[in-house]
Amino acid sequence: MRPEEIGGSVINRVPVCVSDKCGYFTDEYQFMPKEGFSEMVNNILRHPRIKLKLKTDANKLIALSDGVVYYKGKEFDGTVIFTGRVEELFGYRFGALSYRTLKFKTKTYNKPSVQRAAVVNFKASHRYTRVSEFTKFTCDKCEKSVIMKEFPKKCRKGSGKPYYPVPTPENLEKYKKYEEEAAKYKNLKLLGRLAKYEYINMDVAVKKAIELFDEMD
């Protein structure tokens, strides 16, 4: 895919900077949750009013028809916040949306440091696009270090997890149709990268979740 085939939002994610800073982000304050993002999510799920169902197809529990949301076959008057693939929710009515996925490979080194920065991005001449070294995120001092390489590939239906939306004009036109369809259901809210078909970082994901909660409160 050529650069002109995708939206400027994607190209803008790879800025060219002349600087002595080794970080990717330019925010004045940058941090991670003390116990990590996984524990942050686990802490949310431990709330007594949250019931978690694993290995469950949401589309077998939720049905949409003529502006009415059904849960387990009965009309549901509460609010449904959907964060999955929006085209799956509507049975691919307007076609599938394109995504890129990743294959991850980790390697352990018997030395405290492997690369100069926590994350190093690579151009198209490499099979992998990014290498992360985890001890540099947490500033841990260890005798060994672990890196992870990311290999991008096309996300096909039933194979690979959808990580990156591909915002071509065709895909955005399809998504607009799904968005308009979702708007017909007053108690249905779309949230997150898959449901909104947009690339968002973790901080923005958390912020948008809080903003939606405030709107509903």
Protein language model features and the residues they cover:
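C-terminal catalytic lobe of FAD-dependent flavoproteins
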Residues: 161-217
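Mid-domain catalytic core of redox enzymes
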Residues: 62-181
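Active-site/ligand-binding neighborhood in enzyme catalytic cores
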Residues: 1-78
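Surface-exposed flexible segments
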Residues: 9-17, 94, 201-212
